Amino acid sequence: MADKITYITNLQYAQAYRVSASPRDWMRFMDTASRMYRYSFNDQLLIYGQNPNVTACATLDVWNKRFQRWVNKGSKGIALLDETGGTKRLKYIFDIANTHPGYNGEEPYIWQARQEHLGMLLAHLTETYSLPDASSLISVLEQIAEQVAEDYTDDALEGN
């Protein structure tokens, strides 16, 4: 199990470098992250690294109890790091594509960004990340990618 935890930890750092390599890589990551907005940035990196085409993810328990959906036999979960309690462990989530509805099963609500919200989105990102240029979504995302890359580079060099 320790080998798997090490592998997933290394995958997280590798994905941080990968997605910040260029605006195009960042946009690909953001496409996945936009569907995984309830997950932390680190979890989003791991989700993207293991299955960039996910639509909606949840734990086995959430699929079963909240949505009355069942994970298909043989489905491979997406490993995330769980560091609660001071010990690194793995927890697994599954994409909706790997589930099927049970009796009265629900479809989860899938969030979407709409053109009419672009102004509010730009304003929010500009304020949240203290960005100097909010002329376009591409400009804003490039600036955020630079900040994230710098943060993760510093953390990696410090050994965090």
Question: Over which residues does each language-model region extend?
Answer:
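N-terminal accessory/interface modules of nucleic-acid-binding and processing proteins
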Residues: 1-160
